[in-house]
Design a protein with these regions (language model features):
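Catalytic cores of alpha/beta
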Residues: 1-11, 27, 95-133, 147
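Short loop-to-alpha-helix "cap/lid" segments that border enzyme active sites
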Residues: 56-77, 91-105, 109, 114
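Conserved anion-binding
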Residues: 2-86
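Short, surface-exposed acidic/glycine-rich loop or hinge patches that mediate macromolecular interfaces
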Residues: 22, 113-114, 138
């Protein structure tokens, strides 16, 4: 916990934790209690199961079940990564992301496979708080300014249509 205290002390706004949250729910409870609004839990999924230790091991627990268990710790968000799609530039697993986001009560940040502005547009209609775009930014497939514009337009149109 001292490392987290030090990192937040130098100005980091949010900290993402992964495997340790799965291995030690008490630690996560303590962490979220001491640093409310600062802790994000990363859940990496392989065929719906939680992958840990840098994706070298897959747990028997489903990502949704794990997310429901950690909700009581009250993390600020969950980064949900479908590792089968991450970095592949083949598009995200929309059904997996939507299913996950609709079954948990913590804000979800989608990650893994976002390849095009069309992917951004589709995900911006899902019940997700945000998305992480990685390789597609580096390759130039997506311009950040265009992705932001799409998300702002989708949010604005939902608000005008009364769907949020």
């Amino acid at each position: 916990i001292q490392v987290v205290r030090d990192l937040l002390g130098i100005g980091i706004d949010r900290l993402v934790v992964g495997t340790r949250a799965l291995d030690s729910p008490e630690w996560l409870m303590e962490l979220c209690g001491e640093f409310p609004g600062k802790i994000v839990v990363g859940i990496d999924a392989d065929n719906g199961k939680v992958a840990v230790k840098g994706w070298t091991s897959v747990s028997s627990r489903t990502a949704i079940d794990f997310a429901k268990e950690i909700q009581k710790a009250n993390p600020i968000a969950i980064v949900f990564t479908d590792i089968e799609k991450d970095g592949m530039l083949q598009g995200p697993n929309f059904s997996s992301i939507k299913d996950f986001a609709m079954n948990v009560d913590v804000p979800v940040i989608a990650s893994g496979g976002i390849t095009s502005l069309e992917d951004v547009k589709q995900l911006s209609r899902f019940p997700v708080e945000g998305m992480i775009i990685g390789k597609a930014l580096y390759t130039g497939n997506i311009l950040l300014s265009e992705a932001i514009k799409i998300c702002k337009n989708e949010t604005s149109s939902e608000m005008h249509n009364g769907t949020t």
